[in-house]
Amino acid sequence: MEPTSKKPGLTFAGKLVVFLFVAGCLYGAYSLFLHRPVSGARQSQTAANDAAAAASDGEHVEIGIAYGTEKERWLQWAVGEFAKRDDGRRIKINLIPMGSLEGAQAVLRGDQRIHVWSPASSLYKDVFLQEWQVQHGGDKPVVREENLALSPMVVVMWAERHEAFVKKYGEVSFKTLSQALAESGGWQSIAGKPEWGLFKLGHTHPNESNSGLATLLLMAYDYHGKTRDLSLKDILDPGFQTWAQGFERGVSSLSNSTGNLMREMVLKGPSAFDAVVVYESVAIDYLKNAEGRWGELRVVYPKRNLWNENPYYVLNAPWSSAVQQQAAGKFLDFLLSEPIQKQSLVHGFRPGNPAVPVRFPGSPFEAYKRFGLNVDLGDMCTAPKAEVINNLLQWWQRSVGTS
């Protein structure tokens, strides 16, 4: 029997190579595991760090602003001016037109295009914060907020219709608007003008646009004769609900945008609307355009009114990095600067920066006085609690709303 042959073994050098190879693999695996993102929060932080590094190298940062269309012309101009600056050239701003409430719902759904929410007013803010906590919990979704510009609510009417309306009812109020909407004979009964048809009033969709919500709140405040502490009892009052339901069933349009509603009135003339309830700023922006098409407009301020502050909310959302929040803050500082605030006056806003005056030669509030503009207002109402707003919107949807 032949002796068994002995297999060659590893030399010392070979064993050393194998040991070093295995050790290297183990270290690499450990390193990868240690740096692997383990949650959405870790991924967001990594994205923020990457964005910070990019910004420090002078690379571009991109942010999206969901805004109410009442600010469209002013914001578009401001974005163009901001892009001329050194810091502005590194920040790309995407303007995303949305109804105020529509923008809030988009953020709640996780629309990652949006890093700033700029509705027409703060009316819906508490509702938004409550819904965010329910859906996401954790930190508050707003890291910085400022008011850009102020604008009260107004009723805008064609001058000829306004004259006939006041001759019949004595004043323009939610009570007299309700009476006109209830006239089955329309303008024949109001002013002996059958060719004018029914009385046509428009406001925006209250579940999508802030001005529609503001209109409902002013109706409630006016009905109950108060300016603060609107309560659930007030909203659930059968008398109010019956009156408001009759009013709302006569409304001609439920646009999701205040700017679009005013534009439609000016484009189509009295055949579309005799009157609309909009922001003062939107009315001012269209006063001269309307005059050249269908005649003059008249602006009427409700006895009880609401401020629309056009807030600018920098969002603390999971998809918004620290650098994007800083970029949003830089644009906010730019919007609040005096030259940009002065330009807001051109578009009918009352500047949010108190250093910028409203009354001066050439101001729209001086130039357009004959249309009914007035710097001094009557009683201003306060925003009710979130539960009141929620119940008012739910009542409206069940009673007269459309999906």
Model-derived segments and their meaning:
Residues 214-300:
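Ligand-binding pocket segment of bilobal, Venus flytrap-like solute-binding proteins
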Residues 82-86, 111, 118-121, 132, ...:
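Sec/Tat-exported extracytoplasmic proteins
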Residues 192-224:
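Extracytoplasmic/periplasmic solute-binding protein
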Residues 2-17, 21-32, 37-42, 56-58, ...:
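Extracellular/periplasmic juxtamembrane helices and adjacent flexible linkers that interface
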Residues 72-79, 101-104, 122-125, 129, ...:
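Extracytoplasmic/secreted envelope proteins and their assembly/folding machinery
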Residues 160-167, 208, 224-230, 318-328:
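Short helix-loop capping/hinge motifs at secondary-structure junctions, enriched
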Residues 142-155, 240-256, 291-320, 324-325:
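Periplasmic-binding protein-like
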Residues 2, 6-11, 15, 36-197, ...:
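N-terminal segment of the mature folded domain
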